């Protein structure tokens, strides 16, 4: 007979063997369900039918506006200690008004229509290469784009821009800027022939002709080159060169006035200032364009800067009202200002799709090179004099004292450097030493189908999530900050000793 419990109901007593067998069987069933294969179609259908959980943290829409430069932000991106609930403040764009630059110029209707065409955006890098006045020197890995995932622009090694002479050497075909001025009767055929070894499906001669006419009419660099080439046709004319100035005025996005970007120089060019670009009439030797030159970007990306708007220069300054003198505008501040949507402002740069990806990679290499140049020029500030150098030498096991002092010291502040990685490794071990081993190892993955990203991209035609990596990064950063707050302040997993 089954005994009765305290409530009077009969209860069954389980043996230890039965309890162990039951729990073991349930574990086996759970493991078998976890190991059950999931097909791609089944996973995709489950993702489409899935709706956000009631506890899903939605960052809202990007509707907040910076009071200084009209940049668009999410409310969660505000600077908390200087913001109010009804008046958020931001500084990722213009550093609270200290970075002041005019808005981009409105492009011609022809270019605006092309940037709304999905077919054009798919091949925008090819079209830009056709009209680029400098060559893009880098090892671009195109084999990773096999059609099974989003488009990725990946470069190995250094990036450099090269510019040649105004006229091509004898028995050679024109390339890059030479196509604007040499053999103009066959310009369209020359540009298409330049990409004869690539897949030309979708390259439209009509689009090439339209872009050529537009750039010749509005781009100041093209005007300088065309005026110089007219002197080439004069028999017995004096030798000359083209000088592209480095000392630009402190302004951006203004339409370059004639004569402000460069000039034709006759005879000696010894008075050229540092980093000026000197182009000779017929000289087959290509020269490397310095990243410090304001023409570095507009010469390479004429479709993003159709008027020839100049880029960053060391002569640019921030506007600090309470400072005795203006501080220099860093490369990082300049490009951070550029890649923000602004209320009521049309930006070709942000609608560039795959070309925008290439521009971001190019801009990041400029930022990293600027940091490396600063470190190289201030080695004495980063070394703890002789003691640090000796300690590093002993740590490496060097016995030859002649090698001490000949290496470049990369401090821990340089992102990705050996000391940077070692410092973070030591910080992680220090936390474990004080608080013990971690109880949770949590991974946090970004989903490009998050509602915030999808809603923002729906405002712009023909763009995919991979075309705006800046938006993906910003939304992911907000989610990470909110998740950490969810763990630490809400104590979801209990009291947090370290995180």
Predicted features and spans:
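Non-catalytic interaction regions
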Residues: 1-499
């Amino acid at each position: 007979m089954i005994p009765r419990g305290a409530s009077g109901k009969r209860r069954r007593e389980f043996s230890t063997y039965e309890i162990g067998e039951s729990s073991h069987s349930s574990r086996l069933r759970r493991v078998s369900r976890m190991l059950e294969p999931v097909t791609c179609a089944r996973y995709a259908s489950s993702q489409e039918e899935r709706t956000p959980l009631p506890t899903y943290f939605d960052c809202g829409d990007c509707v907040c506006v910076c009071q200084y430069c009209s940049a668009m932000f999410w409310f969660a991106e505000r600077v908390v200690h200087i913001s109010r609930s009804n008046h958020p403040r931001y500084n990722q764009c213009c550093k609270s008004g200290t970075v002041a630059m005019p808005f981009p110029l409105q492009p011609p209707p022809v270019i605006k229509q092309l940037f709304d065409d999905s077919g054009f955006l798919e091949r925008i890098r090819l079209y830009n290469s056709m009209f680029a006045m400098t060559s893009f020197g880098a090892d671009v890995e195109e084999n990773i784009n096999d059609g099974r995932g989003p488009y990725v622009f990946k470069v190995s090694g250094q990036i450099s821009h090269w510019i040649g002479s105004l006229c091509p050497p004898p028995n050679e075909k024109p390339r890059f800027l030479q196509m604007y001025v040499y053999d103009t009767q066959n310009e369209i055929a020359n540009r298409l022939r330049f990409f004869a070894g690539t897949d030309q499906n979708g390259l439209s001669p009509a689009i090439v002709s339209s872009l050529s006419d537009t750039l010749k009419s509005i781009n100041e660099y093209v005007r300088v080159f065309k005026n110089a080439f007219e002197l080439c046709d004069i028999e017995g004319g004096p030798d000359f060169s083209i000088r592209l100035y480095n000392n630009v005025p402190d302004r951006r996005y203004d339409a370059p006035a004639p004569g402000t970007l460069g000039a034709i120089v006759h005879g000696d060019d010894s008075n050229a200032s540092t980093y000026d670009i000197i182009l000779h009439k017929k000289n087959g030797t290509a020269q490397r364009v310095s990243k410090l030159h304001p023409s570095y970007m507009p010469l390479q990306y004429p479709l993003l800067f159709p008027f020839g708007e100049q880029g960053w220069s060391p002569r640019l300054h921030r506007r600090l009202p309470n400072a005795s003198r203006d501080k220099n505008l860093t490369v990082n501040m300049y490009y951070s200002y550029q890649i923000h949507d602004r209320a009521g402002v049309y930006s070709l740069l942000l609608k560039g799709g795959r070309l925008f990806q290439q521009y971001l990679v190019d801009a990041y290499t400029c930022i990293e090179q600027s940091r490396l140049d600063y470190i190289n020029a201030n080695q004495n500030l980063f070394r703890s004099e002789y003691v640090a150098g000796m300690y590093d030498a002993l740590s490496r096991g060097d016995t030859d004292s002649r090698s001490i002092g000949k290496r470049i010291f990369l401090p821990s502040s340089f992102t990705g450097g050996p000391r940077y990685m070692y410092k973070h490794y030591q910080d992680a071990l220090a936390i474990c030493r004080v608080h013990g081993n971690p109880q949770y190892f949590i991974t946090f993955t970004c989903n490009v189908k998050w509602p915030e990203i999808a809603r923002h991209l729906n405002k712009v035609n023909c763009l995919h999530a991979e075309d705006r990596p800046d938006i993906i990064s910003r939304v992911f950063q907000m989610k990470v900050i909110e998740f950490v707050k969810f763990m630490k302040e809400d104590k979801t997993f209990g009291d947090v000793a370290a995180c």
